[in-house]
Amino acid sequence: MGAAKKINYKKVLRDLVPINALSEAHIDEVTRKTTFEDLRSGRYVFRKGDRDYQSVYLLEGTIELIGAAREVVGTVKAGSEDALHPLAQKQPRQLSARASGKVTVARIDSRLLDVLLTWDESAGYDVVEIDAHDDDDWMTRMLQS
């Protein structure tokens, strides 16, 4: 596994699903904790059966998805609609992913993403306390009339 070049991928990450649903502060945190990796042609990004708890995104190049019989069952090209989503997300991995030429991938801890998404969702809820003994509520006024 090679070290990725030093490029700020924050703009690229903010377009990826589900990162695009995070708050700006959480996108910053994901960007800091993401591992960017360059791989040569023929190297595996992950293999069928792996349980790595990572969301892996293709940022540059083309990935071949390899099935159980070692046949290519699909390809994903950087910049495509499929590349906006994590590669073969289900754990354990149902497919292998192999670089078809030089590629750059982003590896993000799936558990971190889950926590940040939950925090952002719960931050969107407002809890309103209802006082059942409030004489000014509309139902009480209506019943008293």
Stretches found by the model and what they are:
Residues 8, 14-17, 34, 40, ...:
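Residue-level signal for pocket-adjacent positions within structured domains
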Residues 18-41, 92:
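Short proline/glycine- and basic residue-enriched helix-capping loop/turn segments at helix->loop/beta transitions
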Residues 18, 43-102, 113, 133, ...:
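Cyclic nucleotide-binding regulatory domains
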Residues 37-39, 76, 108:
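Hydrophobic residues at beta-strand termini and immediately following loops
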Residues 1-3, 27-28, 34, 69:
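Short, flexible segments with low predicted structural confidence
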